[in-house]
């Protein structure tokens, strides 16, 4: 057989194969009855184009597709997306089994964490080990740690106020939340607030970690190849990966220290003044009687919890900061509420702050416009078929919904792109709207650190805006609005972030 004949035969076989795949997906697949673009039904390249080539634009394309095809659409050969706010609690159910999609979780390199656990039964047991450490009842005990880190943050902000230098708030807030989550779960914080510059690279590390996972699911051999080629190749081809590698190494060192120095951990607990055991030292102490607790498992949990507990809360604080600094009326109402309740910042306590309606409105509106994960979160019903209206969805089909679409549904949140704390201040309105506010997701896989995040937000926003007047510096709404979805929300290309100058407020601080 000649080379030409072999080539033509190969092309013909390839064409027949691709045509067969397309025909199957369009006409015989169990999902063929779901409306949506034909190309998306045939190949993941449709998603690849919008998410990788266009830079995190598939969420916006999905929103357009819903306008064209309706509330349920097929967005890939094996995935469904639904946009119907009233269906959210059905999909993200508390008492129905829900698996995760490996397409979403498998490329972060933390397979043994509760976050990445696919099977609902194994997830239940893994989550049960962790959840008590983040219970609402434990948040009173977290206040001293949060306030201590706020005091460190304030020293940095006072220096900026004195020098009138420009502060990039994402850097400050990520250092604050990073030190809180590491101190809370392991007694040993990363101490970013102890440095002179608050480690600017840290504010991008978690974003790079998540973004690289999103890219690697489309190009599964790309990052292993880079790792094999070495750091010089990584620096030349994808430098965003370097701080991610450094972060994983730092996490591995911390977990190894806890794993091999359990007695030292007890001493640090006493020195830190903690009245209750921290998550990771406590899990280490149980390892001898729990064979499923391994150093590798703890590393995966540590990476996940630190990453999740840093960027999302810091981003919510950043969104709140922009809108408070941008709107004097919001700042005045917040200050009045705080001044009427507290004589000084030292008097503030979490339980009282949670009762303040306007502060609560600011925090909920900040959560709504920061989205948590802006990307869709797929759930799989492993046993029973799901049903959306009269459309049956076969078992083991990934089905996703998106906070970025939920939070901008005008039928639920009129003027959804506006920052309006008043929409949350009435308790009845808050109860009604909270059903549709999904920054922490809902159901059996809801964000485990939600209570700690709320504690940081209440204490952080109240303390900082009672103490400082912040003036935006070369910052616009485009620097906080959602322009790209790379798992985490991204501002416009070229954004320098939210930057402010500060001065001490005239009121009590």
From Swiss-Prot:
GO terms of molecular function: heme binding; iron ion binding; monooxygenase activity; oxidoreductase activity; oxidoreductase activity, acting on paired donors, with incorporation or reduction of molecular oxygen
Induction field: Expression is positively regulated by the ochratoxin cluster transcription factor otaR1, probably via its binding to the conserved 5'-ACGT-3' bZIP binding motifs found in multiple copies (3 to 4) in the promoters of the OTA biosynthetic genes. Expression is induced by sucrose, glucose and arabinose which repress the gal4 transcription factor, a negative regulator of the ochratoxin gene cluster.
Binding-site residues, heme: 447
Gene3D superfamilies: Cytochrome P450
Membrane-spanning residues: 7-29
Cofactor annotation: heme
Pathway terms, separated by semicolons: Mycotoxin biosynthesis
InterPro entries found in the cross-reference section: Cyt_P450, Cyt_P450_CS, Cyt_P450_E_grp-I, Cyt_P450_sf, Cytochrome_P450_monoxygenase
Alphabetical UniProt keywords: Glycoprotein, Heme, Iron, Membrane, Metal-binding, Monooxygenase, Oxidoreductase, Transmembrane, Transmembrane helix
Bilayer topology annotation: Single-pass membrane protein
Subcellular location: Membrane
Glycosylation sites: 327, 493
Name listed for the protein in its UniProt record: Cytochrome P450 monooxygenase otaC
Lineage: Eukaryota, Fungi, Dikarya, Ascomycota, Pezizomycotina
């Amino acid at each position: 057989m000649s080379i030409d004949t072999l080539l033509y035969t190969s092309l013909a076989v390839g064409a027949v194969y691709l045509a067969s795949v397309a025909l199957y997906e369009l006409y015989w697949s169990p999902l063929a009855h779901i409306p949506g673009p034909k190309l998306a039904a045939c190949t993941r390249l449709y998603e690849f184009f919008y998410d990788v080539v266009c830079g995190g634009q598939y969420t916006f394309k999905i929103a357009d597709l819903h306008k064209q095809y309706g509330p349920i659409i097929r967005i890939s050969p094996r995935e469904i997306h639904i946009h119907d706010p009233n269906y959210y609690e059905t999909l993200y159910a508390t008492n129905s089994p829900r698996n995760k999609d490996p397409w979403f979780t498998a490329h972060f390199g933390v397979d043994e964490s509760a976050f990445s656990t696919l099977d609902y039964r194994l997830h239940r047991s893994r989550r049960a080990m962790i959840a008590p450490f983040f219970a609402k009842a434990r948040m009173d005990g977290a206040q001293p740690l949060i306030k201590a880190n706020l005091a460190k943050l304030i020293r940095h902000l006072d220096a900026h106020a004195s020098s009138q230098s420009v502060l990039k708030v994402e850097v400050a807030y990520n250092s604050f939340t990073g030190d809180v989550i590491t101190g809370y779960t392991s007694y040993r914080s990363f101490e970013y607030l102890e440095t002179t510059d608050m480690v600017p690279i840290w504010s991008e590390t978690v974003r790079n970690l998540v973004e690289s996972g999103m890219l690697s699911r489309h190009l599964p051999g790309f990052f292993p190849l880079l790792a094999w080629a070495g750091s010089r190749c990584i620096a030349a081809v994808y430098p965003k990966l370097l701080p991610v590698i450094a972060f994983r190494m730092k996490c591995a060192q911390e977990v190894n220290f806890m794993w091999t120095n359990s007695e030292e951990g007890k001493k640090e607990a006493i020195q830190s003044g903690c009245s209750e055991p921290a998550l990771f030292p406590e899990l280490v102490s149980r390892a001898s009687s729990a064979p499923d607790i391994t150093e590798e498992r703890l590393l995966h949990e540590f990476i996940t919890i630190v990453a999740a507990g840093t960027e999302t809360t810091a981003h919510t604080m950043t969104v709140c900061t922009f809108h408070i600094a941008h709107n004097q009326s919001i700042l005045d109402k917040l200050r009045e509420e705080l001044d009427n309740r507290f004589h000084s910042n030292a008097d503030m306590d979490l339980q009282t702050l949670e009762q303040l309606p306007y502060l609560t409105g600011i925090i909920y509106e900040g959560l709504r416009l920061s989205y948590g994960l802006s990307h869709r979160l797929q759930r799989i019903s492993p046993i029973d078929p799901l049903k959306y209206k009269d459309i049956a969805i076969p078992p083991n089909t990934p089905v996703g919904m998106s906070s970025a679409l939920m939070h901008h549904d005008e039928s639920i949140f009129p003027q959804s792109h506006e920052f309006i704390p008043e929409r949350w201040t009435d308790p009845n309105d808050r109860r009604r709207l909270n059903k549709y506010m999904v920054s922490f997701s809902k159901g059996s896989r809801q964000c485990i650190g939600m209570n700690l995040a709320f504690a940081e937000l209440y204490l952080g926003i109240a303390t900082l805006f009672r103490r400082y007047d912040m003036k935006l510096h070369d910052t616009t709404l485009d620097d906080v609005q959602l322009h790209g979805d790379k798992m985490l929300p991204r501002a416009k290309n070229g954004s320098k972030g939210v930057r402010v100058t500060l001065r001490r407020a005239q009121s009590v601080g």
